[in-house]
Amino acid sequence: MGIFDYKNLGTEGSKALFADAMAITLYSYHNLDNGFAVGYQHNGLGLGLPATLVGALLGSTDSQGVIPGLPWNPDSEKAALEAVQQAGWTPISASTLGYTGKVDARGTFFGEKPGYTTAQVEVLGKYDDAGTLLEIGIGFRGTSGPRENLITDSIGDLVSDLLAALGPKDYAKNYASEAFGGLLKNVAEYAGAHGLSGHDVVVSGHSLGGLAVNSMADLSDSKWSSFYKDSNYVAYASPTQSAGDKVLNVGYENDPVFRALDGYSSNLSSFGVHDKPHESSTDNIVSFNDHYASTLWNALPFSILNLPTWVSHLPTGYGDGMTRILDSGFYEQMTRDSTVIVANLSDPARATTWVQDLNRNAEAHQGNTFIIGSHGNDLIQGGKGADFIEGGKGNDTIRDSSGHNTFLFSGQFGNDRVIGYQATDKLVFDGVGGSTDYRDHAKVVGGDTVISFGADSVTLVGVSSLSGEGIVIG
C-alpha cells in the first residue's frame, strides 16, 4: 500500500486521484506564488533573500509576482489555466451551474455569507472526447486572494483562520457549509442531472482550503442530501483533520500550518512544534528546503508565528515535492507514516548542502528513511540505518553511511557518484534499457567502477571490483 493510497482505489487509482487533486489545488491559487517560487529557486533564503522577496513582489521576465499588471511578467494566470486543462480539467461556469452568487472574471466563486465573503473555490469538470461529463472537481483556495484584491481578501481569510483556531465551537467544522452551502447544492444538482454521483466528485484544497475539505467531508452525511458522502477528499497542508476516514490529509512535517490543530481544537503546541500523528495524515514527510537545512534559521523557534518557516507551506513546494514522491520508484514501499525527505533546496544551497534526515522540530523518526532528490544536481547523504535513496535527474553525489542502503536510478538519471558504496548495498536500475547483466555496463576507471547506460552513469568512488549480488537491472 503506497503512501498516498486512498480508500479501496488501489495504487494506480490512488495515484490518479492524487494527481487530479493536486492539479485542482494548484489551479485554485492561479499561480499566486509563482514569483516567490522562481525567485527562491534562483536566489534562496541566504544572501539572495532580498532578490527572492523582490521576485515575490515584482516577478521577473520568467515569473509573475503578486503585484499585477507589470509588463515584463509572463501571464501566470494563463499558465495556471493551461496546466489544469493539460491535467484534464476545465472550469465550469456559474451560468452552467445555474448559480447566481458572486463570481469574478476568472470564474472563481466567492463565499456567500457575511464573514465568509473572501473565501474562494473553483469548480471544474473532466470530460471524455465526446464532451460527456465524467467527474467534477472542487478546489478550495487557501488564505490569499486574487492579485488585485490580495491584501483585503487575505485579511478576511486570516480572520477565518483565527476563528477556526480560537473562535466559536465548530466554526472550522461548519466552514464549508457556511461559506459555500448554496454553491455546493447547485453543484450536486448539476452532477446528478448529468448522471454522476458523489463518488464522481474530487474535493481538494490547501491550507484554509484544506480545512474546507475536512469540513465538507465531516458535513457530507448530513448536508446536501448526503450527495457528497462518497466523494473523494484530499487535503493539503490543512490545519484540521476530519474525524473519520474520508479525507487523506497530506502535508510536510515542517509546515507550521499542517496539523496545527488537533482535530478542530487548538492547544499550546498549535503555536510551536506540533508533530502529533493522526490516522488520516502523512506525518513524516520533510521538505528539505533552505530553511530546514539552515542552522541559523533554526536558531529561531519553530512556530506558525515565525514567518520564515512558512516557506514549507507554499503551494508550489507541495506541487513539485509531493509529485516527485508520487512518481518515485519507491512509492509502493512507502507507507502513510514513512519518513520521506524531499529535496527542495534553492540552486545556491543545493551546491553545498547535503540533503539528509535532520529530524528537526519533530518526534524521533522511526524505521527506514526514503530520500527523494530533485531534478538538479543534488548532494544526498544517507543515515546510519537502511535508507532508500533516489537521486532523480541531474548529476547527483550520494554519500553512503551504513552499507545497507538501496539506490534507485531510473530512466535518464544523469551522471551520479556514490561515495562509500559497500557490497551489502543494493543498486537498482529501472527503465535504463540494454542488457540485464551488470558486467556489460561496468568498467574500472582508475580506482573507481563506472556503471554506464548510454549517456547516463553511476561512479562507485573507490570501488575497483564489483560483485553482481545486489545489482538489479530492469
Regions inferred by a protein language model and the residue ranges of each:
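A mature extracytoplasmic/lumenal domain signature
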Residues: 142-144, 207, 431-433
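Gly/Ala-rich beta-loop-alpha elbow adjacent to hydrolase catalytic centers
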Residues: 205-209, 213
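Low-complexity acidic/polar repeat-biased segments
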Residues: 439-474
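Alpha/beta hydrolase fold serine-hydrolase catalytic domain that processes acyl esters and thioesters
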Residues: 2-62, 74-88, 94-200, 221-388, ...
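A generic structural signal for beta-strand entry/edge sites
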Residues: 133-137, 424, 446-450
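Acidic, glycine-rich calcium-binding repeat modules characteristic of RTX/beta-roll
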Residues: 370-372, 377-438
